[in-house]
Amino acid sequence: GTGAREIGYMFGQYKRIRGMFEGVLTGKGLSYGGSLARTEATGYGLLYLTEELMKCHGESLEGKTIAVSGAGNVAIYACEKAQQLGAKVITVSDSNGYVVDEEGIDLAAVKEIKEVKRGRIKDYLNYRPNAKYVEGAGLWQAVKVDVALPCATQNELLIDDAKALVANGTMIVAEGANMPTTLEATQYLQ
């Protein structure tokens, strides 16, 4: 839940206390020396990488199914770019559970839930009643997708998840979060 507003406050306090205008925090607004498109950069970049990986295998993202974990900036903008590139994202999650929408995630609903209402991802069912919400469990063993994008948290994709993804035919696992795949799972996927 930390955004430009909170970072701006911390940066303002740093500037007030230290009397310096230095770039000590990432995620600042433009008026504080932040970067344009910072919010979208990680999610978009993840998809540009994924697109290039697909090309290496003679494939494209067009028509592929993607599982995304998380519902923060990285996940939201990864979903957005994936949809722009012709893929169908079927999952998003938060710390309480995950949603599977086989028709494709309604990104406008996710943005309203997470960015406007600051709600939980289970509220997605109010927008798309045909979707499925699963509380508590990890999503990686529950879905069959072409691409898996862990964008939620560290160590979220475990060895059993990696084995399930491979068994289900997932072609690519690309990391959006910081170290979301455990070492054991990473070694298995290689």
Give each language-model segment a name.
Residues 1-36:
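N-terminal ligand-binding/catalytic initiation module
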